[in-house]
């Protein structure tokens, strides 16, 4: 079963929260405790679900996959929304705490949900929605003067987005452009566990990103992208000049190192840079924002191959090969 993504919706969930006043200097303990931050996450995330499903005519999906690395509660915001909306038969999957690469395991889960229903279950799934709620500013140390804090506070940002996955037969009824999944792959890089971390602290989630990360990714990226392309019967070196690269912009250095290593043009990564420049690093919500631009761009024709990848704790390198349809 081929699964396609389409109909991206990007809400503005702002409700006037004041993080500097409410959270102060997190490292010296003058801010709110973690449970208070999770309460605000719950409020914002619930607001996101209300906005992305505000059309009364929209039919409920078979499943919703909720993706986040910045807030977790039980019951979750998606469960609260479904209960109040009366969509009680919608399946819920929580895809949490994977950081910047979280969109790809979520797509893999959607692929599994749809594929298994068409092979071994009596009820075939027609649509699986994926909703990202990344509220990273909730965890910033806005007053800290440590060098590492400058990186996290200026690089990371809030991001919210919804899109959908369909079996091929159902996608044709939407009348939308989409991305057909051709291949998926994932690797953990050796000897890299401490280079990127995301751990709960007493007041907030502590994020760390070492200077070695761009170079460790660079050294592994050629073999990785070649393996993805081989799954789809493509030769990377032969095809790369015509590809679009939707690379998660973990930072400018990561994009620079990958582009140089793969020998691709700056124009092939311009959408990644555009999202980083305009929105920052929104963790798991970043790659879907780039996919949205791919689908909206009149300069990227139907049939174009899109090689997308992201990186996170582990170090994990994960990616997908798409075809614009």
What residues fall within each predicted segment?
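Short, well-ordered amphipathic alpha-helical segments that serve as non-catalytic structural scaffolds
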Residues: 1, 41-56, 109, 160, ...
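Condensing-enzyme catalytic core mediating Claisen C-C bond formation in acyl metabolism
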Residues: 1-38, 142-219, 223-227, 311, ...
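Conserved beta-ketoacyl condensing-enzyme motif
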Residues: 2-85, 97, 235-255
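Conserved beta-strand-centric core segments of catalytic alpha/beta enzyme folds
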Residues: 3-6, 60, 102-184, 288-325
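Claisen-condensing/thiolase-fold acyl-transfer catalytic domains that form or cleave C-C bonds
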Residues: 69-70, 88, 94-118, 218, ...
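Membrane-interfacial loop- and helix-cap regions that link adjacent transmembrane helices
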Residues: 197-204, 208, 225-244, 249, ...
């Amino acid at each position: 079963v081929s699964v396609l993504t389409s109909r991206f919706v990007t809400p503005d969930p702002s409700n006037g929260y004041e993080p500097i006043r409410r959270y102060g200097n997190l490292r010296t303990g003058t801010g709110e405790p973690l449970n208070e931050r999770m309460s605000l996450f719950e409020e914002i995330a619930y607001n996101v679900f209300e906005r992305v499903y505000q059309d009364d005519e929209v039919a409920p999906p078979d499943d919703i996959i909720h993706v986040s690395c910045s807030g977790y509660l039980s019951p979750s915001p998606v469960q609260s929304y479904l209960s109040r909306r009366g969509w009680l038969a919608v399946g819920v999957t929580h895809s949490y705490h994977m950081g910047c690469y979280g969109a790809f395991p979520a797509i893999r889960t959607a692929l599994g949900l749809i594929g298994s229903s068409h092979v071994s279950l009596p009820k075939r799934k027609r649509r699986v929605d994926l909703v990202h709620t990344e509220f990273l500013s909730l965890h910033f140390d806005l007053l800290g003067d440590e060098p590492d804090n400058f990186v996290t506070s200026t690089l990371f940002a809030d991001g919210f987005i919804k899109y959908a996955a369909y079996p091929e037969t159902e996608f044709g009824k939407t009348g939308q452009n989409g991305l057909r999944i051709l291949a998926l792959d994932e690797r953990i890089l050796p000897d890299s566990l401490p280079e990127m971390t995301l751990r709960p602290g007493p007041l907030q989630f502590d994020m760390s990103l070492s200077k070695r990360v761009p170079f460790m990714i660079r050294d592994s990226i050629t073999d990785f992208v070649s393996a993805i392309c081989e799954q789809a019967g493509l030769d990377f070196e032969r095809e790369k000049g015509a590809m679009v690269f939707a690379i998660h912009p973990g930072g400018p250095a990561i994009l620079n190192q990958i582009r140089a290593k793969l020998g691709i043009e700056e124009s092939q990564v311009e959408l990644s840079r555009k999202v980083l420049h305009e929105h920052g690093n929104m963790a798991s919500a970043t790659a879907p924002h780039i996919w949205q631009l791919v689908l909206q761009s009149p300069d990227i024709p139907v049939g174009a191959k899109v090689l997308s990848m992201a990186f996170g704790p582990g170090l994990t390198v994960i990616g997908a090969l798409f075809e614009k349809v």
